[in-house]
């Protein structure tokens, strides 16, 4: 056994041993309970970050713990390998994205292996492999055949820098999620998936408690994104005719509202820039035409429109109020989306905050029609009660006056239905998923374009449509347009004439919508999913239905995008008879972000320059609060001592120079320290604030563990010296008489084991580590018994240390593996890989004696030890005979016993 804890040597040896044993290859086993635990697959950006380390260590701890408890556990890994970053790196470095991606995968895989993760690498996949994306294409064709996939022209979000379409979810405050460029609106053809057909079911599963293992926060985010609204769709009649003489829209401008009770407060209508009425008015209005062009920049999402300045322009057109026949002016508003509802909204300035601001800006009448008792309406400023539908009562609304919200909505709906101008309707915020991307590095959409037959699906026998690997994008659009090899020899499947391939590729969220199923049978070239998927993804107690994977782990940032698409994809596969589950993930854990200090200073260009924490010294006030920082060495043009700004804690990122390189951490302290620190510092769901001093503390703890094992080894106290049961509890034909210290040690160890086991089941891994630390403290503090019972001491120590090693093994597997073997536990009960989880010994928890506080006249004067089952009379006798009682020099008048707590002698 090594005299010194050397993590690099220990970890290398342990990993070599696991590799030689092929320790983590998993197959189906009908004799064991199965458990499928999976982390969200990473994008191969080049290097792991500490968020990866935390995510995968959580998964690894769960996997190892369950394996020790007799489960057949699958922990796979793959690569979300398509996407824009690879293209941009190719532009920067002048190399094909395929090469850049493969090199990154190779390096990041080495990093994962250095962490000692229990990954079954035989199931590794990369979404850029033709053998994987063939099935993207195959399922796309099935969706096309079933009408789930379709092609249409629509106004989309266009990123002018990346020159691609963005899904609504990829637009943040009117800017592209990756480039930050102001998003434009364009009309282009593309393929869409009817996720809206599944809206009701997608909503039901997150609102009807059918996903009890999901965080409530995530379910609420999905509920809000799906956005079911029940309201009224009705029309404002008009007589505006187009160039052909026909009434535009049949002479009706339709809107949808959930606030029909405010219909008498409508003072204008607004339409989207793409609305037919706007287009008609712009033909004779150059200013309006210019405004419509201006509206084409900016996002097409509700979030984007909510943050941008609200602008509008009169069209000169009018519609008629359906109840009062009052003429209402039509405006073009940059905040109205053509893709939502009918591309028009009714303007009720008095009771809608957006309309209120718009009316103030353009001098439009504000007409109050709802009153809340005790409130005063001020036409100059918005107050939250203006939109209160719970307390409000209608006023200034003719026959509808005096009605509460629901009553007024029903009454208005009835009248408009009678007039043939309205109907009750349910609408959804969710929109069909646009999957076409005008980029190269993605799954080719399996469509051929023929001059005669249009868009024709590629025959299944010709799949996969393979993406050329030799393209080097130059940033000026999709290189597939001009790639001769991609189009060479392509003919129409219908007529056989020369044709061209579709050059759009699929949104990369398609790749990640089902990869977890492919892990179950990754090498199958005959089917998308097969028997292995049924084994790993389904509860064997359920014939059909239910949820799939047992545990999914990933960041909260994927709550809407990835998770919603994966749920949709699973339901489509179910309806096509490919899987038997309703949902992809039974339980979901969203781990917290890893945070670090952020230091910056504004540069001469007006931007901010960020500094690495190791180059900075913090400045504190008298209370110890960080109030600033200064450089401890020259950085670029900034000399040592320069004052810089402290921005607080924030997510680790390359752009802010506050990341920690896992490889450097492993090189200095070892993988076990990195794993231990990320688990101990905070609960898995909470943010982890990085602290270099705490890393040192984690490393010191592991040195203590090693040194204690070294002491046992030197004293000859190895597991081979005692007969151990498989669970780690002592088991001999004639159990030795444990001395009091040994009994106390065993009681404390088994109490801690009970708590640690409970925390493992709850996945509260920070308290698992703290429990293990308490175990080590108990072992280190153990004092030998009297000579007559010293024979039992080695057994208590070796049992206790064996329990500690097994409690530590899921979080720090390398050091536990090494000590387990060096101290003979492997020879006694088998290799730690498959050693059983230690069981709590109920006998060890039984206390022979208990300690009671001793009071004299209500004041604490010490304690006494009494038999655990002592009667009150026996306790009184022991208390009266205690040194403190005898020192009083008198006979107590009364003895008060509080069972299990204290004895009070009253003199």
Swiss-Prot record:
Motif 'KMSKS' region, chain ranges: 651-655
Motif 'HIGH' region boundaries: 42-52
An annotated GO cellular component: cytosol
Localization (cell): Cytoplasm
Superkingdom of source: Bacteria
Entry keyword annotation includes Aminoacyl-tRNA synthetase: yes
Chief location category: cytoplasm
Keywords linked to the UniProt accession: Aminoacyl-tRNA synthetase, ATP-binding, Cytoplasm, Ligase, Nucleotide-binding, Protein biosynthesis
Any Pfam family matching the protein: tRNA-synt_1g
Name of the molecule in the record: Leucine--tRNA ligase
Record keyword Magnesium present: no
Catalytic reaction equation(s): tRNA(Leu) + L-leucine + ATP = L-leucyl-tRNA(Leu) + AMP + diphosphate
GO MF annotations in UniProt: aminoacyl-tRNA deacylase activity; ATP binding; leucine-tRNA ligase activity
Sites where the protein binds ATP: 654
Gene that this polypeptide is encoded by: leuS
Family assignment from sequence similarity: Belongs to the class-I aminoacyl-tRNA synthetase family.
GO biological process: leucyl-tRNA aminoacylation
SUPFAM superfamilies: Anticodon-binding domain of a subclass of class I aminoacyl-tRNA synthetases, Nucleotidylyl transferase, ValRS/IleRS/LeuRS editing domain
Origin species: Verminephrobacter eiseniae (strain EF01-2)
Enzyme Commission number, as recorded: 6.1.1.4
């Amino acid at each position: 056994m090594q005299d010194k804890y050397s993590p690099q040597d220990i970890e290398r040896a342990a990993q070599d041993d696991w590799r030689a044993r092929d320790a983590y290859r998993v197959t189906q086993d009908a004799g064991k309970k199965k458990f499928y635990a999976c982390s969200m697959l990473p994008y191969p950006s080049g290097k792991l970050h500490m968020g990866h380390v935390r995510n995968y260590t959580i998964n690894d701890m769960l996997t190892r713990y369950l394996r020790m408890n007799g489960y057949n556990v699958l922990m796979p890994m793959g690569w979300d390998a398509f996407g824009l970053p690879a293209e941009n790196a190719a532009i920067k470095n002048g190399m094909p994205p395929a090469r850049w991606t493969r090199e990154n995968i190779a390096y990041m895989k080495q990093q994962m292996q250095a962490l000692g993760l229990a990954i079954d690498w035989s199931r590794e996949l990369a979404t850029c492999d033709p053998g994987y994306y063939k099935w993207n294409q195959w399922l796309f064709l099935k969706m096309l055949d079933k009408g789930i996939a379709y092609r249409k022209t629509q106004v989309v979000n266009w990123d002018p820098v990346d020159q691609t379409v963005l899904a609504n979810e990829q637009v943040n405050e009117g800017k592209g999620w990756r480039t930050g460029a102001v998003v434009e609106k364009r009309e282009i053809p593309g393929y869409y998936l009817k996720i809206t057909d599944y809206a009701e079911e997608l909503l039901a599963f997150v609102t009807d408690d059918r996903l009890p293992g999901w965080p409530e926060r995530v379910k609420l985010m999905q509920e809000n994104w799906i956005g079911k609204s029940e309201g009224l769709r009705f029309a404002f009649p008009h007589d505006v005719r187009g160039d052909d003489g026909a009434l535009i829209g049949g002479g009706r401008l339709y809107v949808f509202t959930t606030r029909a009770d405010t219909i008498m407060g409508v003072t204008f209508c607004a339409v989207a820039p793409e609305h037919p009425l706007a287009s008609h008015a712009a033909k004779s209005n150059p200013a309006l035409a210019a405004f419509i062009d201006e509206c084409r920049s900016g996002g097409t999402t509700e979030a984007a429109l909510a943050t941008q300045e609200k602008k509008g322009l009169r069209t000169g057109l009018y519609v008629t109020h359906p109840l009062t026949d009052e003429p209402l002016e039509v405006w073009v508003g940059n905040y109205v989306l053509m893709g939502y509802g009918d591309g028009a909204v009714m303007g009720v300035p008095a009771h809608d905050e957006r309309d209120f601001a718009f009316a103030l800006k353009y001098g439009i009448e504000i007409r109050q029609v709802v009153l809340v008792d005790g409130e005063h309406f001020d036409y100059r400023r918005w107050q939250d009660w203006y939109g209160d539908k719970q307390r409000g009562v209608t006023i200034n609304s003719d026959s509808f006056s005096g009605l509460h919200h629901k009553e007024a909505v029903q009454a208005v709906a009835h009248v408009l239905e009678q007039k043939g101008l309205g109907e009750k309707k349910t609408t959804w915020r969710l929109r069909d998923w646009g999957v076409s991307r005008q980029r190269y590095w993605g799954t080719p959409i399996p469509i051929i374009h023929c001059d005669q037959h249009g868009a024709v699906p590629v025959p299944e026998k010709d799949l996969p449509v393979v993406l050329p690997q030799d393209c080097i994008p130059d940033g000026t659009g999709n290189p597939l347009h001009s790639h001769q090899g991609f189009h060479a020899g392509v003919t129409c499947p219908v007529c056989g004439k020369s044709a061209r391939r579709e050059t759009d590729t699929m949104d990369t969220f398609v790749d990640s919508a089902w990869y977890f199923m492919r892990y179950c049978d990754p090498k199958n070239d005959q089917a998308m999913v097969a028997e292995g998927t049924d084994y790993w993804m389904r509860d064997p107690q359920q014939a059909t239905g239910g949820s799939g994977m047992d545990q999914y782990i990933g960041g909260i940032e994927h709550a809407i995008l990835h998770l919603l698409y994966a749920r949709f994809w699973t339901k489509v596969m179910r309806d096509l008879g490919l899987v038997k589950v309703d949902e992809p993930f039974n339980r979901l854990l969203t781990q917290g972000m890893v945070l670090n200090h952020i230091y910056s200073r504004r540069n001469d260009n007006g931007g901010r320059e960020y500094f690495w924490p190791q180059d900075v010294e913090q400045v504190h006030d008298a209370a110890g609060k960080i109030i600033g920082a200064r450089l401890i060495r020259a950085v670029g043009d900034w000399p040592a001592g320069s004052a810089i700004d402290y921005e607080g804690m924030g997510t680790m990122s390359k752009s802010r120079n506050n990341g920690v390189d896992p490889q450097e951490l492993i090189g200095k302290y070892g993988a076990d320290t990195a794993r231990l620190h990320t688990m101990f510092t905070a609960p898995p769901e909470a943010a982890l604030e990085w602290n270099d001093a705490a890393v040192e503390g984690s490393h010191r703890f592991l040195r203590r563990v090693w040194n204690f094992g070294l002491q046992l080894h030197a004293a000859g106290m190895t597991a081979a010296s005692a007969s151990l049961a498989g669970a780690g509890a002592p088991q001999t034909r004639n159990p030795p008489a444990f001395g009091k210290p040994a009994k106390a040690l065993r009681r404390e160890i088994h109490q801690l084991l009970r708590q640690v086991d409970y925390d493992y089941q709850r996945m509260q891994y920070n308290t698992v580590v703290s429990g293990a630390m308490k175990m080590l403290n108990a072992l280190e503090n153990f004092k030998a018994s009297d000579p007559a019972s010293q024979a039992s001491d080695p057994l208590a120590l070796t049992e206790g240390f064996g329990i500690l090693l097994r409690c530590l093994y899921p979080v720090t597997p390398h050091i536990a593996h090494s000590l387990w073997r060096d101290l003979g536990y492997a020879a006694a009960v088998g290799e730690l890989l498959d050693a059983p989880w230690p069981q709590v010994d109920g006998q060890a928890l039984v206390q022979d004696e208990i300690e009671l506080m001793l009071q004299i006249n209500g004041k604490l004067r010490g304690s006494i030890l009494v038999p655990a089952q002592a009667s009150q009379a026996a306790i009184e006798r022991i208390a009266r005979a205690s040194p403190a009682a005898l020192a009083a020099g008198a006979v107590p008048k009364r003895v008060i016993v509080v069972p299990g707590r204290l004895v009070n002698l009253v003199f």
